[in-house]
């Protein structure tokens, strides 16, 4: 489905954040390593804050919505199917978390370039940049700490 209006983009932004938070909750229950568990709890907490941020951003910018159609964003490009991704051990869980972070980073980066409202674009860029930081932290967990 094309995300061709400000409302559709904000709705999908809220949805993708909610899905990611729910996925993190599932990963937390599977994590064995306490450092990984804490990292996943931090990421889930961040998602709750991002949900509030998206609601506030939508509310504050609704009067400035530009009715000009937005092109080039499609929901299908940001769908990830985690059913086929192994989740047997902590290393697998880190990989899943990285897939989730990459997905959200890509969406917010792409959306920031398409949204015609500077305030919203700036918010989206910040969310995308934070995802890049999160990926670095997860990469560090996966490479430099024993996870079992």
Describe every region a protein language model picked out.
Residues 31-34, 38, 54-57, 61, ...:
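Hydrophobic stripe of amphipathic alpha-helices that form coiled-coil interfaces
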Residues 104-148:
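Preference for long, well-ordered alpha-helical segments
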Residues 13, 20-27, 78-116:
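Acidic/histidine-rich alpha-helical segments that form the ligand environment
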Residues 2-4:
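N-terminal leader/targeting segments
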Residues 6, 32, 36, 90-93, ...:
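Residue-level recognition of alpha-helical structural elements
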Residues 10-24, 40-58, 101-104, 124-138:
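Alpha-helical transition-metal enzyme core signature, strongest for iron centers
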Residues 56-90:
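Carboxylate-rich helix-loop segments that flank metal/cofactor sites and access channels
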């Amino acid at each position: 489905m094309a995300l061709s209006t400000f409302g559709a983009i904000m709705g999908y932004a809220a949805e993708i954040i909610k899905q990611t938070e729910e996925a993190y909750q599932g990963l937390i229950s599977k994590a064995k390593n306490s450092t990984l568990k804490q990292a996943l709890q931090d990421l889930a907490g961040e998602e709750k804050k991002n949900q509030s941020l998206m609601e506030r951003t939508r509310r504050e910018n609704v009067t400035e919505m530009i009715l000009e159609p937005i092109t080039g964003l499609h929901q299908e490009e940001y769908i990830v199917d985690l059913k086929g991704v192994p989740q047997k051990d902590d290393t697998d869980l880190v990989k899943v978390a990285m897939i989730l972070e990459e997905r959200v980073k890509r969406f917010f980066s792409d959306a920031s370039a398409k949204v015609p409202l500077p305030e919203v674009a700036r918010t989206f860029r910040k969310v995308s940049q934070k995802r890049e930081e999160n990926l670095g932290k997860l990469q560090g967990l996966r490479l430099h700490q024993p996870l079992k």
